Amino acid sequence: MNANIWVAASDGNLDRVEHILRESKGAMTPQSKDINGYTPMHAAAAYGHLDLLKKMCNEYNGDINVLDNDGDTPLHHVEDVATARLIVEELGGDFTIRNVEGQTPYDSFVENGEDGELIEYMRIKSGVADVHGVDGVQGEGVIDSKLLEEFKDNVRYTLENDPEEGADEATLQRRRQLEQIITGDNAEEELERYIRAMVREQMLGQGSMAGSGDEPDSKRRK
């Protein structure tokens, strides 16, 4: 029965995981390792089972920074930004821990080519400079922090001072999108992501902040 806890955690079967933890009377925990050091915590993180992660951490003393045999934390195994946010912002995950190869979770995500939004979120959280430019575009695409802040200030000024009267539909749509970003829960991160997408679009000749109303489909994030 106990051997199935890793499968149950991978499947997000919360009831099954809880049953195993209770029935084992302490023999199995969220930190219990298989032969590779893989734990239920790693499994739940890898498959994005948020409720299970919260349950194991909050009710069963789960260690969100437990290491497997490769020195990976559950955060190293994450594949989506929602799970990363939960681990870092709610469960106390340490994004500075390096595995046996010397990689932080951010380093690992970049090497493995994980989801772009996940990489960007961890880059910002880790305080890593965008040395490769906007979303990986090199050369003139690099936006330093000072220029980025100027972009942000310009956006805010435009929203506060430019009238809507007489604006075309594309401009109004862009304005509404920016207003939603500014008033959202993660305004700074979302605004930075929006600006980087717009600059990248301009670089690729697909439009500009002044001329194109929408972000490319590939840049839209849920």
From Swiss-Prot:
PROSITE patterns: ANK_REP_REGION, ANK_REPEAT. GO terms for cellular component: cytoplasm; nucleus. The keyword Transit peptide does not apply. ANK repeats lie at residues 1-29, 36-66, 70-99. InterPro entries: Ankyrin_rpt (IPR002110), Ankyrin_rpt-contain_sf (IPR036770), Espin/Espin-like (IPR052420). Keywords: ANK repeat, Repeat. Coiled coil: none annotated. Signal peptide: none annotated. It comes from Saccharomyces cerevisiae (strain ATCC 204508 / S288c). This is Ankyrin repeat-containing protein YCR051W. Gene3D superfamilies: Ankyrin repeat-containing domain (1.25.40.20). Present with 784 molecules/cell in log phase SD medium. The lineage of its organism: Eukaryota, Fungi, Dikarya, Ascomycota, Saccharomycotina. Pfam families: Ank_2. PANTHER family: ESPIN (PTHR24153), FORKED, ISOFORM F (PTHR24153:SF8).
